[in-house]
Design a protein with these regions (language model features):
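Hydrophobic/aromatic-rich, well-ordered segments within soluble, folded domains that form packed cores
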Residues: 13-34, 158-180, 553, 560-565
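Flexible glycine/proline-enriched surface loops and loop-helix/loop-strand junctions
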Residues: 5-9, 152-156, 543
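Extracellular/periplasmic catalytic domains that process cell-envelope and extracellular macromolecules
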Residues: 16-20, 136-138, 452-455, 590-592
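Active-site-surrounding "flap" and adjacent substrate/cofactor-binding loops of secreted or lumenal enzymes
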Residues: 2-5, 18-22, 27-90
Length: 663
């Protein structure tokens, strides 16, 4: 027995009234779930959010120091202008009115289209979404993507499903209140409520052309290349080429555009012709108001929070202003902040320990794929080739983004928001068609998260997630493999989930499977879909809400693969120490190694949500609720049954033949 090491395990919240085999998530976290009160300014809280709180405090220290010492700097100018509530109140509606004047003055649909593009470049929500990213069939170059947008509610389902009727009614009231505050409905000879009802009706029609969350996961269906100079011909009705020019993207120079949801573009192009200009202008005003509401006087901030915070998420109190100010700086200058953050908060030895963990996870995947009994050699060879080409990024980028051409103005919040958004817009537009920057990160080092990028075939772990409860360099290996090891395995697993498996080792959307193997893969993943379709979070009504197994499939494969392979990787780490089996690993604090590994996963996902937030996320989030990121996974892993002596008849029990095994 070895009690010398820090186990990395917390047992203070265990609920012994609940058996591990009935509800492992609650067994590990039950007393915390029963007694913990979510802070009033958030809709969800837990272990992951402790990390986010720490990162936020660290970033606040950086931002406030720079804002005080260098008020003319980009960080100082933006933060101080956000925090200057006296000026914001005295300016009133004037900054917004300057911004929306082109909407009010648009005399033709062409003028309005140009205005929508200019406002989109300045960071306001509009009809069309767009971005530049890696071309999924030519992963050596960037390409411009056009996507569906235009809604003020989280998803198109809100506009058509009966269970959201109360939310929709509250949304209409919210729009009316905002128009009452601005007085802008009078410009259209409408009352605020008439304006709100017209806007909601218009958004409902836009929503009818949206792809749903499941269809939107189909990478092949969303890859529709069109020459930018042929967009008007392909989608007549909306002046797309004129819109692109106003955005700053010359169609002649842009080359190819990937249209993600062509039926959406066709639908709204037809709407553009058939709907009165006044309706489009009124709706565009609403887009501007809701985009800028967090930066207007307090009456707007409070009303915006009343709907998007209280009604949609159940949050009781608005976050402190400094937190919102830090978030605004993060949104505009994430890497400039990141460079400052890692200089203080990421010891180099963390990177070395992480690399060891990652390499063991990759080796465990290699061994697993090599020994899969359901895969033919032709597919196995391609899978191993893809695995060998994985790129790992840990901590922070080797090269930082250059912000030197962005100048922000002390004392002018709206101008700073516009300049920062335009800088980012131009950055994206300018690189369309360029070779891919292999050093780029899509997350800042101070972000508590991780990701897999299919077209780059890379896994990325920002510095801020490399802390307890997920990663503790002083803890026993079992806790780290159950924590950050599971996260690493999850991200690698995305390379082989139902979407990632469609990309080859070079990142191209290119089917490398034999027909026979993909049919077997689909059979196994379909069983996982059926399992998750039966789940409802403990705080929701199962008659109204269930997990969408198709929407969450990719993340569920990542979770199951991640924990299964983390267990194999831990065995590799034990073998390097001369320990040949899990059973021979040290017992620490009365827990076996396997128990500690599973426990670490369950404590890592210890979270609690408000019901309103849970309702929203179950509809739009591709991740399963956290309780099923634990229970839905462990019940499919044989070693869990052995570790906790789970008998047949337990609530989580699955017969061996019903346990899903993929990787």
């Amino acid at each position: 027995m070895d009690n010398a090491k820090n186990s990395g395990i917390t047992t203070e919240w265990v609920d012994n009234a609940v058996k591990p085999g009935d509800d492992f998530f609650r067994h590990v976290n039950g007393r915390w779930l029963d007694t913990y009160e979510i802070p009033a300014d958030r809709s969800k809280d837990g272990g992951l959010y402790t990390l986010r709180d720490d990162a936020e405090k660290h970033v606040r220290e950086i931002v406030e120091r720079i804002a005080k010492e260098q008020p003319e700097s980009r960080i100082g100018a933006l933060y101080n202008s956000f925090m200057d509530t006296d000026k914001i109140e005295s300016d009133g509606l004037e900054p917004l009115m300057r911004e929306v004047a082109p909407i009010l003055n648009a005399a033709t649909s062409e003028q309005l289209a140009v205005t929508l593009a200019l406002l989109s470049r300045a960071g306001l929500a509009q009809l069309l979404g767009w971005y530049t990213s890696i071309d999924q069939k030519d992963p050596e170059h960037y390409v411009f993507y056009l996507t569906q947008a235009g809604l003020g509610l989280p998803d198109e389902a809100y506009y058509r499903e009966e269970k959201y009727e109360q939310v929709c009614a509250a949304y209409i009231e919210h729009i009316a209140t905002m128009f009452e505050l601005t007085g802008l409905a009078e410009s259209f000879n409408l009352t605020p409520m008439e304006a709100a009802q017209l806007i909601f009706s218009h958004e409902t029609e836009i929503a009818a052309h949206h792809w749903d969350v499941v269809k939107n996961r189909d990478a092949e269906a969303k890859y529709n290349p069109v020459k930018a100079t042929e967009l008007d011909e392909k989608f007549p009705g909306f002046p797309l080429q004129q819109w692109l020019l106003a955005l700053g993207a010359d169609p002649k120079e842009l080359g190819t555009v990937i249209v993600s949801q062509p039926s959406f573009l066709e639908g709204v192009a037809n709407m553009w012709q058939s709907t009165p200009l006044m309706t489009w202008k009124l709706w565009a005003l609403w887009c501007a108001i809701r985009s800028r509401a967090p930066y207007l006087p307090d009456a707007f901030v409070q009303e915006n929070f009343n709907f998007y915070g209280r009604t949609l998420s159940g949050t009781e109190e608005l976050r402190e202003r400094w937190k919102r100010g830090v978030a605004a700086v993060e949104n505009a200058l994430d890497q400039e902040l990141g460079k400052e953050y890692v200089a203080v908060h990421f010891p180099p030895e963390h990177k070395e320990k992480m690399l060891k963990l990652v390499n063991n996870l990759l080796e465990a995947y290699r061994r697993s794929i090599t020994n899969l009994d359901w895969m033919t050699e032709a597919t196995r060879e391609k899978a191993l080739e893809k695995l060998s080409k994985f790129v790992t990024k840990i901590g922070y980028p080797d090269e930082w983004r250059d912000y030197s051409k962005l100048t922000l103005v002390p004392g002018d919040l709206f101008e700073n928001l516009r300049r920062a958004a335009a800088f980012n817009s131009d950055f994206m537009i300018d690189r369309a068609g360029d070779p891919v920057d292999k050093n780029e990160w899509l997350m800042s080092p101070q972000t508590v998260n991780a990701y897999y990028m299919p077209p780059a075939n890379e896994i990325v772990f920002p510095a801020a997630i490399l802390r307890p409860p997920f990663f503790d360099p002083e803890a026993d290996d079992a806790a780290n493999y159950g924590g950050i090891g599971m996260v690493i395995g999850h991200e690698i697993g995305h390379g082989f989930d139902d979407k990632g498996a469609l990309y080859d080792g070079d990142g191209a959307l290119n089917n490398w499977w034999t027909e026979e193997d993909f049919a077997e893969f689909t059979k196994r993943t379909s069983a996982l879909v059926q399992q998750y379709n039966a789940y409802t979070p403990a705080n929701l009504d199962p008659q109204k809400f269930r997990v969408n197994g198709e929407l969450t499939l990719g993340e569920n494969i990542g979770d199951l693969s991640g924990l299964s392979i983390a267990l194999r990787a831990y065995e590799i780490a034990l073998a390097e120490q001369g320990i040949t089996s899990l059973e021979d690993a040290p017992v620490i604090d009365g827990m076996t190694a396997a128990q500690r590994l599973f426990w670490s996963t369950a404590q890592g996902w210890r979270t609690k949500s408000r019901p309103q937030h849970a309702e929203m996320m179950i509809s739009v989030d591709p991740h399963s609720p956290d309780e099923f990121r634990v229970n839905g996974v462990v019940r499919n892993i044989d070693e869990f049954y052995d570790a906790f002596d789970v008998p047949e008849g337990s609530k989580l029990y699955l017969a061996p033949e019903d346990r899903v095994r993929i990787w």
